[in-house]
Amino acid sequence: SNRNVLNVSCFKGAYVMKNLIQNCQNADVIGYWLASDLFSDYYDTKEILYGGCGLLTKDGIRKPSYYAFKFMNALGGQCIGKNENAVATRSGSKQISICCHNYKHFNFRYYLVEEDEIEVERQAGMFEDNERLQMTVRLKNVEEGTYQIKIYSVNQEFGNIQNEWEKIGYYNDLNLEEMEYLKSVTQPKIYLRQQKSVKGILEIETVLGAQEIQNIIVTEI
């Protein structure tokens, strides 16, 4: 449906990444319909976010689902590990890229209302749980040395246009400057740290909130 607020939420980002990880070794190319809400615009609403299923809003603001594709597009050509929540790849000999998610599926409450009647404020109660996921990625046979670990994260607080829209009171009549502000603040959080390998093993720990997606870039310094 193009009138479902979950299309704009972190849920959709985690859902997209989950499906891309499941199928990334089964297809050469994976497409998505559709790129922008411009192609599913409704004349009876002036809302900035009305639940369109595009990766971008009609004003060009990036949704969590957009970042799911962007993160996955940063993966290398050689898959070195994969499970239900993550995939790790190598690009050359110096860089490893990991994509991971903490997808949560619907509970019974989701099916009790029409898709176009779901309220933004009540999304959290429509999933099986909202528990965090502690994840450890163990990279073997790496060169001895120091590595830079860069984590891009999209969650309820960062890279989430719904959260930024809420901060301005769900206001719709925005001028150009205000719209550009929303575009600029809807960005993934970036974490940086350095870590040494031990006996050819590099262990990377991260925590993902419910419906959070991450792209972890590991580069030898």
Segment roles from a protein language model:
Residues 1-119:
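Aromatic/acidic polysaccharide-binding cleft in carbohydrate-active enzymes
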Residues 100-221:
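C-terminal beta-sandwich/jelly-roll accessory domains of carbohydrate-active enzymes
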